[in-house]
Amino acid sequence: MKWILVLALVCLAVEYSYSWKVSERCLKGHGKFQADQEIGNGLATAKGQCKGTDSDQKKAGKCDKHCTGVCLGSGGSCGDGSSQKPNKEDCYCKSK
């Protein structure tokens, strides 16, 4: 019975620690950007995260992989010049 209680407490501590870190990242912004919620297309925008990416990197999908990391796994991609993702230097994160 003690082991179940200890396991439950460890799981709660890990979950609390993870949620605290995620909340802290959201409040402070991650590195160089502050995520802004775009109302028109429903995508959160991470400004300037695709700066300096060349066409070879975009072809290899490296930019989109980078954006998925920036978007904390919710899925994301770099702008493509369309009306939904106009700025090619920004990451656009999918809403959860």
UniProtKB/Swiss-Prot annotation:
Effect of mutating residue 64 to A: No significant effect on inhibition of host Nav1.5/SCN5A activity
Effect of residue 57 to A: No significant effect on inhibition of host Nav1.5/SCN5A activity
Localization terms from the record: Secreted
GO cellular component, one term: extracellular region
Result after altering residue 53 to A: No significant effect on inhibition of host Nav1.5/SCN5A activity
Signal peptide annotation: 1-19
S-S bridge residues: 26-71, 50-78, 63-91, 67-93
Superkingdom classification of source: Eukaryota
Listed result of changing residue 51 to A: Reduces inhibitory effect on host Nav1.5/SCN5A activity
Keywords of the record: Disulfide bond, Ion channel impairing toxin, Secreted, Signal, Toxin, Voltage-gated sodium channel impairing toxin
Biological function: Salivary protein that inhibits host voltage-gated sodium channel Nav1.5/SCN5A.
Additional record remark: Intravenous injection of the protein shows anti-arrhythmia effects in BaCl(2)-induced arrhythmia models in rats and monkeys.
Protein name listed in UniProt: Salivary protein FS50
Organism name: Xenopsylla cheopis
